[in-house]
Amino acid sequence: DRIYEALEKFDPKKKIKKIIHLQGDLPNVSKKLIVSLADIIKNNKCIATPVVQADKNEILDENIVKCAASFKNPKPKIGEIGNALYFSRCPIPWGDSIKWHHLGIYGWDRSILEKYIKLKPSNLEMSEKLEQLRALEAGINIKILITNEKPIGIDTISDLKKFKKSINDY
């Protein structure tokens, strides 16, 4: 909702048709990942967002959003694009399958964003506290891009210390 409000102020004549929505708490997102999301929305009226394979410490962490997605390949590889089925703070899907850590970066087709902001928050969205569930419940396609990048999310003081260390190590 906030991204649309900013877009309306920045582009009231609606010339911009594709939007990349970056999060301030993910300061080290690569240009390559941004371009990859832009490529997906270039020819698709959808939302696009990346996932990376979750490590075992992240699977049970409720601060890490997981994504259940379908891919054509049963063992999808980096760069493959699939479709989101559900997002949760719980480990999904069940069993031994790969758990995907959702990175909170989005590519939007403007018409999809305009449709999205007219929707009321959904029951699942309010239950999980995940806004992307509103889109899924409304039948909006969310394309999932597998990446090997894992930008450092800064949600706690500990995360900030990790990020500062990564900059100093660079």
Each model region followed by its residue ranges:
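Residue-level signal for alpha-helix termini/capping positions
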Residues: 8-12, 42, 168
